[in-house]
Amino acid sequence: MKKNNWIYIWLISLSVLLGIYFLSDDGFYSVPKNVVTKEIINTKPENLSSQYKPSIDINNQKSPEDLQNGYEESIAVVLPIPGEPPISLWRPPLYPTPWAISPNDHFYFSRPIAADEINWPLANYRYGYFFPDSDIIHTGIDITARRGTPVIAAAPGTVIWAGVGLYYGTYNEEDPYGMAVTIEHDFGHKDKKLLTVYGHMDRIDVEEGQRVETGTQLGIVGNTGFSTGPHLHFEVRLETNSYFRTRNPELWLSPPQGWGVLVGQLKNIDSQFINLKEVYIRNIETKQSWMVLTYASNNINRDEYYKENLVLSDLPAGEYTLSFSNDAVTYKYDFNIYPGAISFISFHERTGFSSELPPLLSPKEWDNIILTDDFLP
């Protein structure tokens, strides 16, 4: 009998130790609900412990009647329960703006969502993609955020639009942007004005003609206009406040410190852009992976220098492999991402890959670029 008692005591002690372990900082962590696997992969392992805390079932308590009636239950290990999305996964602070290592770069804008929130592009709604089940081109990036999250100015300037009707240029409750703000900034690029757009807000906190600084609250994230859920639609426009004058915001938003941006140009054997192609990026050292689509159409505004059809920002500096398949052939190319810089890759189905930069445009060539109210080919 005594021997059996010692066995019971030993088993109970072991259960207690296991319970303590599984609820400790070294134990299991709950993965927040709706966090994409890619984002988990892109988080440094040593930082996961600060992001995902132990899950403890505080509701698993017994009433006094249960205790008086001799209610007994073995110590249970509480499995993680999906929680709310984290405020932000680990990311370094941004480079100060304006930031440009080369004369071809123009990281002039800070993020329109503060650093304590998710403030990077939603992977499935990048610039140049088609809206789902349509042939309408997405002319900005979408940043997922909780409803009510402050939307802030990406750079100093003057509010030239605040309200509903941005696309039509006049009040229209059916406007796809919903409640939106446009800022004309104090600076330009190549003697052309720069503007930024903030769409789908639930509330606007500024008015037309108002002066704003970097970080001024413009309103709050919402779900107005053509939107399937709360998020911020952000655009960069060149010269005029027109849907047809957009550029890829990922080439204009300052990257996190120590991180860089991949810019690509993929063409087929006929020298035509390869559209809507899945391109995979893999960090050789950490094995982290990303997938980005090339632009959906030839009729999309590209950077005047890079003439890209692929952009993937916020990549930690390091060695990478790019791969994609076309006409049953898989192509691979190793390249480097450098801190605070753009890494350019071109591919032609006839000649293969190259990391050689495009030739510089002369001032005369820049002046000859035609700006029309239609997408440039």
Name every feature range the model reports, one short phrase each:
Residues 285-309:
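Short, acidic Ser/Thr/Gly-rich low-complexity loop/linker segments typical of extracellular
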Residues 161, 200-203, 220-223, 268:
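A residue-level detector for short acidic-glycine micro-motifs
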Residues 198, 312-313:
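Hydrophobic core positions of the immunoglobulin-like beta-sandwich fold
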Residues 146-148, 152, 189-215:
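Short histidine-centered loop motifs in beta-beta connectors
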Residues 20-34:
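Hydrophobic single-pass membrane-insertion segments
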Residues 45-179, 186-188, 214, 227, ...:
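Surface-exposed, glycine-biased beta-strand/turn segments
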Residues 171-185, 208-259:
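Conserved, short, structured surface segments that act as functional micro-motifs
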Residues 1-13:
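N-terminal Sec-pathway targeting helices
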